[in-house]
Curated annotation (Swiss-Prot):
Catalytic activity: an N-acyl-L-alpha-aminoacyl-tRNA + H2O = an N-acyl-L-amino acid + a tRNA + H(+)
Family: Belongs to the PTH2 family.
Gene Ontology biological process terms, A to Z: translation
Job description of the protein: The natural substrate for this enzyme may be peptidyl-tRNAs which drop off the ribosome during protein synthesis.
Biological classification of the source: Archaea, Thermoproteota, Thermoprotei, Sulfolobales, Sulfolobaceae
NCBIfam families, per database record: arch_pth2, PRK04322.1
Compartments in which it is found: Cytoplasm
Record's protein name: Peptidyl-tRNA hydrolase
GO molecular function: peptidyl-tRNA hydrolase activity
Family annotation (Pfam families): PTH2
């Protein structure tokens, strides 16, 4: 089990901004599974992921198009996925999509979507 967060590298975000956006993605994924009517399978994956130490990986995407392509593939594969839009209070324009979160889910399923991406 793992979670992947994909971060756009075409935006001029500082390290702190990136860290905050990655945290937003991770928290949003968990909240979506816990608070909404999500698939029973997702709840099982969440529990397994928590018991395995909550492994996460942060990866680079070149731009919005690549981010949305990976996000849509995750949804089509049956994985939990979320998009993070910035509030625009500091470095980025309001509503800018900064990152996407995928998972938690089976490592193989996530790797099939993100295996070509580099670590941030």
């Amino acid at each position: 089990m793992k979670m992947a967060v994909l971060v756009r590298t075409d935006l001029d975000m500082g390290k702190g901004k990136i860290a905050a956006q990655v945290a937003h993605a991770a928290v949003s994924l968990v909240l979506e599974i816990v608070q909404k009517r999500s698939k029973a399978e997702w709840k099982e994956w969440l529990e397994m992921w928590i018991n395995q130490g909550q492994p996460k990986i942060v990866l680079k995407v070149k731009n919005l198009d690549e981010l949305l392509e990976k996000y849509n593939k995750a949804l089509q594969s049956g994985l939990p996925a979320t998009i993070i839009q910035d509030a625009g209070k500091t470095q980025i324009e309001p509503g800018t999509i900064t990152c996407a979160g995928i998972g938690p889910g089976p490592e193989e399923m996530i790797d099939n979507i993100t295996g070509d991406l580099k670590l941030l």
